[in-house]
Curated annotation (Swiss-Prot):
[4Fe-4S] cluster binds at C83, C89, C92, C171. Keywords: 4Fe-4S, Iron, Iron-sulfur, Metal-binding, Methyltransferase, rRNA processing, S-adenosyl-L-methionine, Transferase. The keyword Cell inner membrane does not apply. InterPro entries: 23S_rRNA_MeTrfase_RlmD (IPR001566), MeTrfase_TrmA_AS (IPR030390), MeTrfase_TrmA_CS (IPR030391), NA-bd_OB-fold (IPR012340), SAM-dependent_MTases_sf (IPR029063), TRAM_dom (IPR002792), U5_MeTrfase_fam (IPR010280). Catalyzes the formation of 5-methyl-uridine at position 1939 (m5U1939) in 23S rRNA. It is an enzyme of class 2 (transferase). It comes from Shewanella baltica (strain OS185). Residues 12-70 form the TRAM domain. The active site is at C406 (nucleophile). PROSITE patterns: SAM_MT_RNA_M5U, TRAM, TRMA_1, TRMA_2. S-adenosyl-L-methionine binds at Q283, F312, N317, E333, D360, D380. Belongs to the class I-like SAM-binding methyltransferase superfamily. RNA M5U methyltransferase family. RlmD subfamily. This is 23S rRNA (uracil(1939)-C(5))-methyltransferase RlmD. The lineage of its organism: Bacteria, Pseudomonadati, Pseudomonadota, Gammaproteobacteria, Alteromonadales. The gene is rlmD.
């Protein structure tokens, strides 16, 4: 049988060609969208209302991807990125857009996803929770890369969609005291005899000081420990080591746990604080986390003796303040270590109307003897959402549901389930937890109507 040559869609001739395209919108991941020969073309770094020169990098049946070569006609929202590492580091992807433009885009994207996939067009759009656009991160993990040829250890962040480490000298979204430690730490780590055995470095800015967690794959000798101890004393920072088993050891002093305030000031009687073990999940934007907790309290309006269920409760980010307001709170978390720390936090805050349980949140927890009647519900799941949990929660019929989401796609899917079960979307608001990036977080309030 005769066979005829058919050009592959990703031929080198097609991909090497440069095109001039007009960008009309952003996708939900922050890439510009243009049209070419009936296809949608995604262009990272391009903004709406721009004319750009691009080079195709990938051709599919219904879409293509392109690399931005030049901005021919810039958008009024285009700004010069503040970070010198922006074009190589994979941490931020919207520094080229004004902060107001970023927030307008995120809010529009949130509404679009909710309307398209949940049919949730009602409710009141609440003002976005916003804060500082720079130096807002109180926690970051830096990667290390040891070059066997040069014997040099690089410290930085991963490049976008790559395992390569981009050495950095500063980070414009990291808390300034932590950013200022990057270069000194890079010099210190290169002075250690065990530098080939070092893993990531985590930097934390807490209310009780600054912390560094250094991952090690083998024990350090006394000389290396002495250098770390001297560095900690010089820079007024707590340093701890994390070994292969995940155990932590303080350097030059006993291990101190970082502490964050959730409500009020630590000197106030109504203050609530949260301590955590390095490695546990906490919200990296402290300013926005406080605003988020306050909004959740306002929307749920906990009353004394109401029973509130907090699913995916972590170490008590919402449970602790809810209990402080007088409600009886049940917190359920799937990670046993975080449940242990949540109980420590409840005791430290003198909260006795609060109980934490470790459980599989995809299982039917309504059958547990401790569950009982639930008046209100708070959900704060990971990116996968709470679809499995919502299957058994229909038995509980809480009057109010506050859903805190770090993924609008799973929020929309789960919202559709709640709407089908007689809930009405009352409030929806953007949470700008990660300025200078495309990431969208949101909070939604649902009330039972039937």
């Amino acid at each position: 049988m005769a066979q005829f040559f058919k050009a592959k869609p990703n031929s080198s001739k097609q991909l090497s060609a440069k095109l001039s395209l007009s960008v009309n919108q952003l996708d939900h991941l922050g890439a510009g969208i243009a049209q070419h020969q009936g296809k949608v073309v995604f262009i990272p770094g391009a903004l709406p209302d721009e004319t750009v020169t691009v080079q195709l990098t990938e051709q599919k049946k219904n879409y293509a991807r392109a690399k931005l070569i030049k901005v021919d006609t810039p958008s009024s929202e285009r700004v010069e990125p503040e970070c010198p590492h922006y074009h190589t580091c994979g941490g931020c992807d919207l520094q080229h857009m004004s902060l107001s433009g970023q927030r307008e885009h995120k809010e529009a994207a949130l509404l679009d996803i909710m309307a398209k996939f949940a049919g949730a067009e009602g409710g009141t759009l609440s003002p976005a929770l916003t804060g500082e656009g720079w130096h807002y991160r109180r926690r970051a993990r830096l990667a290390t890369l040891f070059d066997k040829n040069t014997k040099h250890l690089s410290l930085g962040f991963r490049a976008a969609s790559s395992s390569n480490v981009v050495p950095i000298s500063q980070c414009q979204v990291l808390a300034k005291p932590l950013s200022d430690l990057i270069v000194p730490f890079a010099k210190l780590l290169n002075q250690l005899s065990a530098k080939a055995s070092l893993g990531h470095l985590e930097l934390i800015a807490a209310d009780n000081g600054h912390f560094a967690v250094l991952r090690i794959t083998k024990a350090l000798n006394d000389k290396d420990l002495a250098k770390l101890s001297a560095f900690a004393e010089q820079h007024l920072i707590h340093i701890c080591l994390q070994d292969n088993e995940g155990q932590f050891q303080g350097v030059g002093a006993e291990l101190v746990l970082p502490v964050y305030q959730l409500l009020g000031d630590k000197a106030e009687s109504d203050a609530v604080s949260l301590s955590f073990t390095p490695g546990n999940f906490v919200q990296v934007n402290g300013q926005i986390n406080k605003a988020m907790v306050a909004q959740a309290l306002d929307w749920l309006a906990p009353a004394p003796d109401e029973r509130i269920l907090d699913l995916f409760c972590g170490m008590g980010n919402f449970s602790l303040p809810l209990a402080k307001m007088g409600a009886d709170v049940i917190g359920v978390e799937g990670v046993a270590e975080m449940v242990t720390q949540a109980r420590v936090n409840a005791k430290a805050n003198n909260l006795d109307k609060l109980t934490f349980y470790h459980g599989d949140l995809s299982a039917d927890l309504s059958l547990e003897p401790w569950m009982g009647k639930i008046d209100k519900l708070l959900l704060d799941p990971a990116r996968a959402g709470a679809f499995e949990s919502l299957q058994w929660l229909k038995k509980m019929k809480p009057r109010k549901v506050v859903y805190v989401s770090c993924n609008p796609a799973s929020l929309a899917r789960d919202s559709a389930v709640l709407l089908e079960r007689g809930y009405r979307l009352q409030q929806l608001g953007l949470i700008d937890m990660f300025p200078q990036t495309h990431h969208i977080e949101a909070m939604a309030l649902f009330e039972l109507t039937k």
